[in-house]
Design a protein with these regions (language model features):
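Active-site beta->alpha N-cap acidic-glycine motif
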Residues: 1-57, 61-62, 68, 137, ...
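Terminal accessory/targeting
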Residues: 1-4, 13, 102, 113-167
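A mature extracytoplasmic/lumenal domain signature
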Residues: 7-11, 33-35, 70-72, 94-97, ...
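Short beta-strands and strand-loop turn motifs
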Residues: 31-33, 63-65, 92-94, 121-126
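Alpha-helical scaffold elements lining the catalytic groove of polysaccharide deacetylases
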Residues: 36-57, 72-120, 132-138
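Short aromatic-enriched loop/helix-cap "lid" or pocket-rim segments at secondary-structure transitions
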Residues: 18, 77-79, 164-165
């Protein structure tokens, strides 16, 4: 199975070996912005450019997929247009797994209930907590048992076609 990993644009928070491993295992590297409606579009692009420079140095690949920490609704239409105009595809998690606040079992129950209640594409947001590794293993097992197709987010999969169309 492959996944998309949203790396913070603040590259000082990166574990270089982990970033290399993400790319080596065929996963998609993407970026996670920390922006609100007051963040200048040029500043967001500068952050993404710096992160891409570091990602390319470490892995030889650049990323054109981005998400905002607080969701694309926290961005203005103009900000989304700047990002889309620069060639980025915006993604929002459809479900926060809850692994930041809950133990793995509670987060698993919440996430599986969501999977069971929808037939659409589910983008699950996982955090970096003690519960995350166990939750990830349990979810991968569940997805396999249920025959749910899973794949990584790529530049060409359901891209944003306009600033008002974020996924």
């Amino acid at each position: 199975r492959q996944a998309a990993f949203f790396l913070p644009t603040d590259t000082s928070k990166w574990d270089d070996d982990l970033v290399r491993r993400i790319a080596a295992e065929g996963h998609t590297a993407a970026f996670l912005l920390q922006a609100d409606s007051k963040t200048d579009g040029a500043d967001m692009l500068a952050d993404l450019a710096a992160a891409n420079e570091r990602l390319t140095l470490l892995t030889g690949v650049a990323a054109r997929i981005a998400a905002n920490q607080s969701g694309s609704d926290a961005l203005t239409e103009a900000q989304r247009s700047v990002l889309i105009g620069a060639g980025y595809r915006l993604w929002d998690a459809g479900l926060d797994s809850g692994d930041a606040e809950k133990n793995a079992a509670e987060a698993y129950t919440q996430t599986v209930q969501y999977f069971a209640s929808t037939s659409g594409v589910v983008v699950v947001r996982l955090h970096h907590s003690k519960a995350t590794p166990r939750l990830t293993e349990a979810l991968c097992s569940y997805i396999g048992r249920q025959g749910i197709s899973a794949g990584r987010i790529t530049y060409s999969v359901a891209p944003v076609n306009s600033a008002s169309d974020t996924r």
